[in-house]
Amino acid sequence: MDIMKDKIRQALSELDILATEVQIDQWLDYLKLLEKWNKVYNMTAIKNIDEMLVKHLFDSLAVAKYIKGDSTVDVGTGGGLPGVVLAILYPQHQFTLVDSVGKKIMFLKNVKKSLSLNNINPLNTRIENLEGNFDNIISRAFSSVDTFYELCKHFLTEHNQMLAMKGRDLEERNLESLPLNIEKYSIKVPFLNAERNLIVIRKKL
């Protein structure tokens, strides 16, 4: 476990993120819960905690600096990625975690109770049925960027942003004709030799 903690500290340093030992312990406790539940409920295709450390934890932390304001909705959150990871980092920030699969929300309610994460609100619903105002609308491996925008555009205002975490295939062909400001950032994930991108969508003022 000390080796994993050292790896987390190194990743935090590379990402220029300040975190406490308590937060590091919370991230590890979360990954242990994810690994445990995954054996029964198939929460994620990644089975072992060492791989989860890089492909889930560090991948989620790599977008932390792009989170603005006080509230975020995590669309198709699955096992809580990136929402739970970011909620541990930003305890004053409210995260609404949305997924249509009941077992995943059941898991996240267990995470909330086990880790005393009072700033997450897991909801078993479809994103198109959700109402509310959020500073960030984020998704990770949820769908194409086009589909993400179509399902979530009712949240987008002049004052917030949508963030799509993607791999190599960006698939945002249909957005270019819309009155949107679209920015693409190349994301470096510590210990991961793979292309990662972040698409940030805002309304044109």
Curated annotation (Swiss-Prot):
Source domain of life: Bacteria
Keyword Cytoplasm attached: yes
UniProt xrefs under InterPro entries: rRNA_ssu_MeTfrase_G (IPR003682), SAM-dependent_MTases_sf (IPR029063)
Subcellular location: Cytoplasm
Presence of keyword Membrane: no
Listed HAMAP family: 16SrRNA_methyltr_G (MF_00074)
Protein's job: Specifically methylates the N7 position of guanine in position 527 of 16S rRNA.
Classification via Pfam families: GidB (PF02527)
EC number(s) recorded for this UniProt protein: 2.1.1.170
Name under which the protein is recorded: Ribosomal RNA small subunit methyltransferase G
GO cellular component: cytosol
Family: Belongs to the methyltransferase superfamily. RNA methyltransferase RsmG family.
Primary location class: cytoplasm
A GO MF term: rRNA (guanine-N7-)-methyltransferase activity
Upper taxonomic lineage: Bacteria, Pseudomonadati, Pseudomonadota, Gammaproteobacteria, Thiotrichales
Catalysis performed (reactions): guanosine(527) in 16S rRNA + S-adenosyl-L-methionine = N(7)-methylguanosine(527) in 16S rRNA + S-adenosyl-L-homocysteine
Keyword annotations from UniProtKB, A to Z: Cytoplasm, Methyltransferase, rRNA processing, S-adenosyl-L-methionine, Transferase
NCBIfam families the UniProt entry points to: rsmG_gidB
Residues reported to bind S-adenosyl-L-methionine: G76, L81, I127, E128, R140
